[in-house]
Structures are given as C-alpha cells and as structure tokens.
C-alpha cells in the first residue's frame, strides 16, 4: 500500500516502461551496473541528511527474473539513508558494491522501493527482453516528471483514480492544504480505517 508509506496526499508523478533487450554474445558489458538514486536535482538541492523520502516507486516486473543475468534490478538494502556512496577507483558507479543484491522475482511481481535507495539496472544475458513498468508516487505538491494522458478515460475514473491521475484543485493552495474533495483517498481511508489512520 503506497498510502501506508506516504499517506493520503499523493498522486502518480511518473510512469514509464523499461525494456532491456538481450546482450549480443560478443558483449563485454559485464554486469552493466550504474548505481544511482532517483530524482536528480532533489539529491543536490535538499539540505538535510539523510535527504527526505518524498516519493516511492512501484516496479512491476513483467518478465521472469527468478534467475540472475536477466537484466535484474540490483539494490543495496538500507542505502536509502545514505546520501552518497564511496565507489571503487577505476570502476566508479559500475562496481559491484558490497552488500548489493539482484532482485529475483517471478513475472507479475510488484516491488515497492524508496526513491533514495541506491539501485541499478543490469545487463540482460537471457534469451528474452526484460520488461518492467515503473509507477512513481509522490506528494501532490511535488511537480510531476512526465505526462499522465488519461483524458479519454477521465469520465470513467472514480474520484480516487482522478486524485492519483493529478486532478487539479480549484486553488493551488489546496495542493498543500487540501479539502476533502481534493483528496478522496483520505475520505476513503477514514471511512474504512478510522480517523487515526489519516493522522497527522
């Protein structure tokens, strides 16, 4: 449950599909790692340490990644609290880092991760392309990082879906001071789980 992590004042701020084709037999790419945290300038301009969470991603893996070498998602557990990593000289961000691990999952598995988590894609040495869809959820006051083109379906969406698909409030102040009509997710949570579930 994304709202169990971020709360109810959220929307979908990005969505994208990633396809990693198989490497050719002659490939010298190795693991093909490139360690990073998401959201670029946020990691430079936030002055606190550790930096605030602000968003989470849901990675929906469509391919069978139950074995390594298939373009697996690599992570360093616990690294979301580390603003920087010390990379080995010569290898830099391509290095296999101590404590890192590939995520091995069956097709259809959803993995929720903090945007601050140091992670990487990897090279695919399987016979099939690795396919995954990433959904990023953030607070409504954080600007989106891509379009949400659902206009043709808008009338069929329920109020919570409209909130998640960035329905604009009548006043910009209501991104940070929302009314119930702006955040039907809050109304739903309170109805089903009680007032304590929507605090603070």
What is the predicted function of each stretch?
Residues 1-6, 48, 52, 76-80, ...:
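Short N-terminal helix-initiation segments at or just after the protein's N-terminus
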Residues 1-22, 42-53, 62:
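Signature of the catalytic double-stranded beta-helix
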Residues 11, 20-22, 26-27, 120-122, ...:
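Short catalytic/ligand-binding loop motif for oxyanion handling, primarily in non-cytosolic enzymes
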Residues 11-14, 57, 74-75, 112-113:
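A structural signal for short, well-ordered beta-strand segments and their strand-loop junctions
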Residues 15-17, 78, 115-117:
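Short, well-ordered beta-to-alpha junction loops that form the rim of enzyme active sites
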Residues 15-17, 58-60, 133-137:
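A structural signal for short, well-ordered beta-strand segments
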Residues 26-103, 142-152:
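Catalytic core of non-heme Fe(II) oxygenases with the double-stranded beta-helix
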Residues 82-117, 122-200:
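Conserved double-stranded beta-helix
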